[in-house]
């Protein structure tokens, strides 16, 4: 499985998980000039920007450990563009991480903020 296939595998698994707990998936792999957001969803009237990290093993550390400050900056800028493009100013939003390790799913709500 190459990197693209692995990414799709973990993102599809994360989508199924989020939908199973009541999230409505609005967009997958949203791209802007700043970067990409894996999943954009909505729950309880909150827009949730989700970064998906997956590992089959922990040989190279956990998925959530691989989210750098630079990556967070790209996600935030991309999210702000999505909000503007879709006239969502004034809506509540947050940034989550869904980390998958083998068959385990870890959902970290409010993993980071705009600051």
UniProtKB/Swiss-Prot annotation:
InterPro entries, A to Z: Restrct_endonuc-II-like (IPR011335), tRNA_endonuc-like_dom_sf (IPR011856), UPF0102_YraN-like (IPR003509)
Alphabetical list of Pfam families matching this protein: UPF0102
Disulfide bond annotation, renumbered to this chain: none
GO molecular function: nucleic acid binding
Residues spanning the signal sequence: none
Family membership: Belongs to the UPF0102 family.
Name listed for the protein in its UniProt record: UPF0102 protein SYO3AOP1_0546
């Amino acid at each position: 499985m190459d990197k693209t296939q692995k990414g799709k595998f973990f993102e599809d698994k994360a989508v199924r998980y989020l939908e199973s707990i009541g999230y409505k998936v609005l967009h997958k792999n949203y791209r802007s000039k700043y970067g990409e957001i894996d999943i954009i969803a909505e729950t309880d009237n909150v827009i949730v920007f989700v970064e998906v990290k997956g590992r089959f093993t922990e040989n190279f550390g956990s998925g959530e450990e691989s989210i750098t400050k630079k990556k967070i900056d790209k996600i935030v800028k991309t999210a702000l563009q999505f909000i503007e493009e879709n006239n969502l100013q004034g809506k509540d939003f947050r940034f989550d991480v869904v980390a998958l390790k083998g068959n385990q799913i870890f959902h970290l709500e409010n993993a980071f903020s705009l600051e």
